[in-house]
Amino acid sequence: MAVSPKINRREHILQCLAQMLETSPGQRITTAKLASEVGVSEAALYRHFPSKARMFEGLIEFIEESLLSRINIIMDDEKDTMKRCQLVLQLLLIFAERNPGISRVLNGDALLGENERLRSRISTLFAKIETQLKQILREKTLREGKGFNLDEAILANLLLAFAEGRIAQFVRSEFKLKPTQHFDEQWRFIQHQLLQS
């Protein structure tokens, strides 16, 4: 029973951190400001997280778990190459749109001036997603007997760059320019180009 309040407090701290990232774009979040937002002392924050870097790691763990587990579901449920790519990109964009504060972590904006390992973890997450896209594209040859004229690694990088660009626009516009805006039309164009290659 004693564990539950601690878990809830940790979650509450992370939710407040994400909320502050959303409502204070471009501003650095200090532990003093976060403690005030949570309604506890800085010492109480440090009872749950030994450092601010660990708080950001908690958000990154949430991001990794949310995205990678859903990508695995897409891989299991959908077999069509283009539909898989579409769903992975759509997942990234919808996730960022529904979690504006966390999109600043995805974009790296919230991690400026923070511990290098945090930026490294986000880079690793995007590398995993790019690898997943590359695998999806390579499986097209195995499944359909026809590949692409361009290397799958180059195409996977292009697809991920598209999603990262949309997330960057979202952050830069202070969450006004939605990442999913015009996605259906853009995807139709991208898909057409991919199928031509």
From Swiss-Prot:
GO cellular component: bacterial nucleoid; cytoplasm
DNA-binding region listed in the record: 30-49
BP GO annotations: cell division; negative regulation of division septum assembly; regulation of DNA-templated transcription
Domain of life, per lineage: Bacteria
Molecular function terms, GO-annotated: DNA-binding transcription factor activity; transcription cis-regulatory region binding
Main location group: cytoplasm
Cellular localization per UniProt: Cytoplasm, Nucleoid
One Pfam family from the record: TetR_N
Residues annotated as domain HTH tetR-type: 7-67
Annotated keywords: Cell cycle, Cell division, Cytoplasm, DNA-binding
PROSITE patterns: HTH_TETR_2 (PS50977)
Family of this protein: Belongs to the nucleoid occlusion factor SlmA family.
UniProt subunit comment: Homodimer. Interacts with FtsZ.
Xref: PANTHER family: ACREF/ENVCD OPERON REPRESSOR-RELATED, ACREF_ENVCD OPERON REPRESSOR-RELATED
Protein task: Required for nucleoid occlusion (NO) phenomenon, which prevents Z-ring formation and cell division over the nucleoid. Acts as a DNA-associated cell division inhibitor that binds simultaneously chromosomal DNA and FtsZ, and disrupts the assembly of FtsZ polymers. SlmA-DNA-binding sequences (SBS) are dispersed on non-Ter regions of the chromosome, preventing FtsZ polymerization at these regions.
Name assigned to this protein: Nucleoid occlusion factor SlmA
